[in-house]
């Protein structure tokens, strides 16, 4: 048995179906670091799978029954459905089939754990908590939902007692995770295809918080009405609140922005009057990012970190991939790639962009899933108000069938009907390039938003602009 886990040390190859997924790859990487043999498949190779191969994993491009080889256990995510050839082969052989969250929970069993949940902000907050614990000398194990720039990966295996994980509420699996400290950033109606109703999602978050042990801690953002209501329902667990509001235990005050950097103080109201961390800075704009940082500060203080350590760690924060990531600057125009695909996220990112530049903000969005656009259509029509120009690409279907009234052109029409002065459709990367050449001027910012292929467009855009300009 491995000292860091209860998994048998002699366990044969662990096969991941969909190993290139951001949630699966982090678990695979930590297992390899612990000495286990890992293999897996995905539809195509990627930077993630290339990294895993460089660490010793065996990768199969495409999914077929023969890929299992001598696998002793098969790990699947909620995206893997009945009929997948590798899943069917595993069941035919009688192999254990383990959900991603179940394997993650196994890795967490021998440690104290910090689990970060919320409809938005999980990945950035997870990265911030990891950054602070690194600075505090805790040497945590980390499994995140995005690539942490300081690691060059979404995971690392540390030697310390603590483990920091992003807790995914999309399929309810976060309630399987044995959290010691549970963070809740916000709660919005999302992933209704799993939960069925907002009340069921609320219950899921309630269970997430109340599942912590009696000696644990819940860290909750009471700027969000749903989270404040959750706090009011929890009566038998210790809770520390954070936010901008005057009642928060860990509160941001004196916030200002300068050249895209947030400067603020943190009032530690739960520690008594006069306890303040002064002179905090965070090298990324956005009130939502400051809020995420407050959650990390609350955890760091709970674990005994000093004010100077916290201040220095956040000032050097390197960020996380696809969370307001600058991918280039051409002719004075800054190009940003961001994962935001929910109206709340889009509005927050565009507000951050407005705080970061003196010029105009040009938003380019690829809606993710017809079902999301359909269920939140009015919110999508009003979340782009901070953008001077909005361009909407074709919906990234993610396997869904089109829904009447929930397409690209419908959203453009909806934006115009709701009063946006400059909304238009784009068809392809060439259209995006033409748009930027036509609209962008020095000092402007182009923000590409979405969870699909829009990231590739954003990353290609600087070279396209420079190549055509040469």
From Swiss-Prot:
Its EC number is 6.3.2.8. ATP binds at residues 118-124. GO terms for biological process: cell division; cell wall organization; peptidoglycan biosynthetic process; regulation of cell shape. One of its GO terms (molecular function) is ATP binding. It catalyses: UDP-N-acetyl-alpha-D-muramate + L-alanine + ATP = UDP-N-acetyl-alpha-D-muramoyl-L-alanine + ADP + phosphate + H(+). Pfam families: Mur_ligase, Mur_ligase_C, Mur_ligase_M. It is found in: Cytoplasm. One of its GO terms (cellular component) is cytoplasm. Belongs to the MurCDEF family. NCBIfam families: murC. Cell wall formation. This is UDP-N-acetylmuramate--L-alanine ligase. The lineage of its organism: Bacteria, Pseudomonadati, Pseudomonadota, Alphaproteobacteria, Rhodobacterales.
